[in-house]
């Protein structure tokens, strides 16, 4: 994912977001990295690698991940979520879309928060950002 925080968000809050994202990426069950987006159009980026789609779905619905979304999304202006798979079976792509859709269906408050973003792109983009 890549994102940019709203310019009016105080530096102390940005620092807390960075600390939380860094801690989350270091304690998850995936190989992950969080940091500044170098050379891109965003401030921050994170990449995670999972051995299975089940692990990925569990992370997406983990209470700590959901709490970070609920705290962070109101502070973000632009967000891009992307999924990369090394399996070229179209069914895998469909399953990833379904993982996101199940998450949005189970947590409609996230859709409301995503609707407040100026820009959102990603798998199964919900609400006003749906394509």
Language model features: what each stretch is:
Residues 60, 69-72:
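Short, flexible helix/strand-to-coil boundary loops that buttress conserved ligand/catalytic motifs
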Residues 63-65:
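N-terminal soluble domains immediately following signal/targeting peptides that reside
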Residues 1-44, 51-58, 77-131:
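Short S/T/G/P-rich N-terminal loop/turn motif that feeds into the first structured element of a domain
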Residues 67-70, 78-79:
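Short arginine-rich
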């Amino acid at each position: 994912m890549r994102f940019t925080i709203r310019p009016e968000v105080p530096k102390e809050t940005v620092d807390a977001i960075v600390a939380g994202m860094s801690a989350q990426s270091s304690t998850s069950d995936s190989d992950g990295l969080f940091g500044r987006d170098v050379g891109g159009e965003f401030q921050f980026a994170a990449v995670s690698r999972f051995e299975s789609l089940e692990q990925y779905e569990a992370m997406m619905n983990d209470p700590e991940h959901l709490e970070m979304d609920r705290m962070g999304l109101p502070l973000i202006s632009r967000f891009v979520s992307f999924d990369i798979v090394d399996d070229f079976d179209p069914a895998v792509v469909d399953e990833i879309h379904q993982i996101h859709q199940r998450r949005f269906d189970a947590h409609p408050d996230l859709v409301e928060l995503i609707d407040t973003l100026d820009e959102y792109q990603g798998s199964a983009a919900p609400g006003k950002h749906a394509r």
